[in-house]
C-alpha cells in the first residue's frame, strides 16, 4: 500500500493448496481495516475446492521502533543459524519492487516477507500447508540470529496424538541474544 511506507508487518498468515499457480490467477486485495496505526489486508484466490490466501496486519511503528543492542548481536546458536545479508535483501527488494524506506540504507531492517520466505525455504514444508508469523522486533540486515524449534507441551495428550495423523505442526522462534524477533507456526496437512 503506497500510503503505508515505513510501516512494518506485525503478523501474516497464508495458506497454500495443492494446485500450481498460474500467471492468470487473480488475487483481489481487500482492506479490512485501516487507520493511522494499523492496516489489515486480506488477499484470497479460489480455484475449485482449493483456496490460497494471505492475511497481513501492518503497523505504523512511529518513533517507537526499538532494535535492541548491537552488542553481542553477532553471537548465534550453531544448530540453526539465521542471517539475512545485504545482497539477499537488495535482490529481494528489486524483485518485489519494495521501496519502503525502513528497508533502505544504514541500519535497515529485513523485510518481514523475506524472513518468512527464508524460514519456509529452510523448512521445506509439504503442500498443502498454512503458516502464521508474528513479528515482535525488527531484525537489522546482516545481524545474526538462530531458529529455535519448540516442543509441544501436550506430547502425551490423546487428542493431540490423533491430530498428528492429520497434520504436522512446527512452532519456531527466530531469536537473537537480546530478543525474540518472530514467532512462527507452520502446519502441514497430511493427505
Label each PLM-derived region with a short phrase.
Residues 129-131, 143-145:
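Short beta-strand or tight-loop elements
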Residues 135-137:
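Beta-strand-rich interaction surfaces with strong enrichment in secreted/lumenal proteins
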Residues 1-19, 62-130:
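Hot-dog-fold acyl-thioester-processing enzymes
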Residues 3-81, 139-142, 148-191:
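HotDog/MaoC-like acyl-thioester-processing domains
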Amino acid at each position: 500500500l503506497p500510503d503505508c511506507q515505513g510501516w512494518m508487518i506485525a503478523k501474516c498468515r497464508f495458506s497454500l493448496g495443492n494446485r500450481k499457480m498460474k500467471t492468470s490467477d487473480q488475487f483481489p486485495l481487500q482492506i479490512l481495516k485501516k487507520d493511522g496505526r494499523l492496516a489489515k489486508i486480506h488477499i484470497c484466490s479460489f480455484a475449485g475446492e482449493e483456496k490460497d490466501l494471505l492475511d497481513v496486519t501492518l503497523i505504523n511503528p512511529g518513533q517507537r521502533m526499538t532494535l535492541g543492542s548491537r552488542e553481542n548481536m553477532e553471537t548465534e546458536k550453531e544448530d540453526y543459524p539465521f542471517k539475512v545479508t545485504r545482497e539477499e535483501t537488495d535482490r529481494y527488494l528489486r524483485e518485489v519492487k519494495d521501496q519502503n524506506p525502513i528497508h533502505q540504507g544504514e541500519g535497515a531492517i529485513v523485510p518481514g516477507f523475506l524472513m518468512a520466505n527464508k524460514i519456509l525455504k529452510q523448512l521445506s514444508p509439504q503442500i498443502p500447508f498454512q503458516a502464521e508469523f508474528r513479528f515482535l522486533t525488527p531484525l537489522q540486515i546482516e545481524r545474526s540470529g538462530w531458529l529455535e524449534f519448540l516442543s509441544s507441551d501436550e506430547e502425551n495428550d490423546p487428542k493431540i496424538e490423533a491430530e498428528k495423523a492429520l497434520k504436522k505442526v512446527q512452532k519456531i522462534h527466530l531469536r537473537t541474544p537480546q530478543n525474540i524477533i518472530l514467532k512462527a507456526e507452520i502446519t502441514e496437512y497430511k493427505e
